């Protein structure tokens, strides 16, 4: 869309009044924001930036969330799996999952948090010993599944099964409106060679239970928009006696993003983990009073007789990085309607392209 729009402006806009134009092209937006990260602070001179990366006709985006990863590493001692235990595997499945930005306000279950509730209860009530925990995968996804292998004293195996059934019923009730398919099951497993030491196990489970997850704050400027959130993305056993817990924090307010990451990191540090924060990327705090937004709203209503929806997204856009390099920019993000984005089914709704072209030209003419 960006390339096509720039060509149209150059080739077809004869007679259309508009200010001097600069065209900014970036690379690697989907996988690493490489182009935006490397944008020079002296490359642009304009006051307004119209980002052509939105995916719905009739919507104008004026904000996005920045993000940062927080990774906690627990180091444990391997101990021989004790005798006299019944070994089991617990499987938490059936959750919907979703994007940790777009869907964080949907009240979806987090498999890592739910399975931790069972494991911590088993530890405190019957001396459960943990051999492995594997939950979630992608850092930007709400985890759908989690699995753990553990042992309980043989005489308490039936009690562990009853406890699992109780938690299964609890989760089904708690998430009947959002994750109706949630399942928690336990089955027999082979005896593992080792378990993690009891002290690290307790610290890990208490940290997973206690760490924040979900929406932390709503926007003060845009009703219904999540401002700040955190997602407990994955728990993985790694080589060298390590357990790696990955989480991600998002916010359209840079200071709030930093505070969320610090809060999550503090919880893990208190539990004895080593914590590292990723480089991250900045957000774009919505400005509903922007002159560029007012021009765009008026242009859309003038052309099509209806008001556009003004939105912000709790996910990353390049605009946050643009604003970091050029803090005085006024920005909006618009585009024609796309469906199935980032999949083999990606497609463009052709009927919206002409509307998008007319809308863009009207904005430029009015500036």
Regions from the PLM with identified roles:
Residues 41-42, 108-125, 152-157, 202-209, ...:
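His/Asp/Glu-rich mid-to-C-terminal helical/loop segments that flank catalytic regions of hydrolases
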Residues 103, 110-112, 117-133, 278, ...:
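Active-site-adjacent substrate-binding region
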Residues 147-149, 183-195, 233, 244-254, ...:
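A short beta-alpha structural unit
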Residues 220, 227-243, 248, 297-298, ...:
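Zn-dependent metallopeptidase/amidohydrolase metal-coordination segment
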């Amino acid at each position: 869309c960006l390339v096509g729009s720039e060509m149209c402006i150059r080739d077809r806009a004869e007679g259309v009044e508009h200010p001097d134009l600069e065209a900014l092209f970036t690379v690697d937006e989907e996988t690493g924001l490489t182009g935006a990260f490397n944008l020079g602070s002296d490359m642009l001179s304009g006051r307004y930036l119209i980002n052509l990366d939105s995916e719905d006709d009739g919507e104008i985006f004026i904000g996005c969330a920045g993000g940062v990863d927080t990774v906690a590493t627990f180091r444990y001692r391997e101990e021989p799996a004790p005798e006299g235990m019944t070994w089991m595997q617990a499987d938490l499945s059936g959750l919907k999952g979703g994007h940790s930005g777009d869907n964080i306000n949907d009240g979806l279950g987090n498999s890592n948090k739910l399975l931790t509730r069972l494991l911590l209860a088993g530890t405190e009530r019957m001396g459960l010993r943990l051999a492995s925990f594997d939950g979630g995968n992608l850092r930007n996804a709400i985890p759908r599944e989690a699995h753990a292998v553990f042992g309980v004293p043989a005489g308490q195996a039936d009690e562990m099964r009853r406890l699992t059934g109780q938690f299964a019923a609890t989760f089904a009730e708690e998430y009947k409106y959002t994750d109706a398919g949630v399942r928690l099951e336990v089955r027999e497993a082979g005896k593992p060679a080792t378990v993690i030491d009891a002290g690290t196990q307790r610290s890990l489970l208490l940290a997973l239970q206690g760490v924040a997850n979900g929406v932390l704050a709503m926007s003060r400027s845009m009703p219904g928009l999540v401002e700040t959130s955190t997602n407990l993305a994955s728990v993985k056993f790694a080589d060298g006696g390590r357990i790696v817990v990955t989480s991600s924090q998002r916010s359209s307010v840079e200071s709030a993003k930093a505070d969320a990451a610090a809060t999550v990191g503090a919880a893990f540090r208190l539990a004895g983990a080593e914590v590292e924060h990723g480089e991250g990327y900045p957000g774009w705090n919505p400005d509903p009073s922007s002159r560029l937004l007012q021009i765009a709203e008026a242009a859309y209503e003038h052309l099509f007789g209806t008001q556009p929806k003004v939105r912000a997204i709790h996910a990353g856009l390049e605009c946050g990085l643009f604003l970091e390099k050029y803090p005085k920019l006024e920005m909006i993000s618009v585009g024609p309607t796309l469906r199935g984005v980032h999949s083999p089914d990606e497609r463009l709704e052709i009927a919206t392209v002409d509307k998008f072209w007319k809308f863009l030209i009207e904005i430029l003419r009015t500036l």
